[in-house]
Amino acid sequence: MANRGPSYGLSREVQEKIEQKYDADLENKLVDWIILQCAEDIEHPPPGRAHFQKWLMDGTVLCKLINSLYPPGQEPIPKISESKMAFKQMEQISQFLKAAEVYGVRTTDIFQTVDLWEGKDMAAVQRTLMALGSVAVTKDDGCYRGEPSWFHRKAQQNRRGFSEEQLRQGQNVIGLQMGSNKGASQAGMTGYGMPRQIM
């Protein structure tokens, strides 16, 4: 947030609400996974939101992460530059976001570049990394490194096939939603709005 002044009023309240969503425990888990997944000499950042942002801000760690989820030779980002120029770093973040979407992360789970670059919504960055980890665990293609229990496995399609005979048998069953013609009935019930006759 070096380029932005302090926010006041409603903007401040909104920013505080966004900052409350940030999870320090999740940060530790994500840092451990990224370092393990990349399997390179990536230094562990000091704990804290500002350090986490600074660690990811140039885009190199994110690009190495998405490349490590592909087999060798099929990496989506062939050239990762460790440039100090702002627009180059933002371009690398954008490349990561596009590659994550192609990998299978839903558009609704992807953060905006300014969320990371300006530190506006680091919780959104965490959500994107969690979604990326979930997709990697679900794919189970051998490229994921780390504990499978760190991320939720996404639901998979499970089609069922029924024969014509099974479908015909299902038509003979009276479902419980259809009601029953036995047992309790509405006999003796009064209509709505009528007073109850007690004698």
UniProtKB/Swiss-Prot annotation:
Recorded hits in Pfam families, A to Z, give: Calponin (PF00402), CH (PF00307)
What are the boundaries of the region Disordered? 178-199
Which sequence positions carry the modification called Phosphoserine?
163
Q: CDD domains, per this entry?
A: CH_TAGLN3 (cd21281)
Give the GO terms filed under biological process for this record.
Answer: negative regulation of transcription by RNA polymerase II
Q: Where are the Calponin-like repeats?
A: 174-199
- Which stretches make up the Calponin-homology (CH) domain? 24-136
Q: Name one GO cellular component term.
A: synapse
Q: Which UniProt keywords apply?
A: Phosphoprotein
Where composition is biased (Polar residues), the residues are: 178-188
Of which family is this protein a member?
Answer: Belongs to the calponin family.
Q: Which PANTHER family match?
A: CALPONIN, TRANSGELIN-3
- What is the name listed in the Swiss-Prot or TrEMBL entry for this protein? Transgelin-3
* Recorded name of the encoding gene: Tagln3
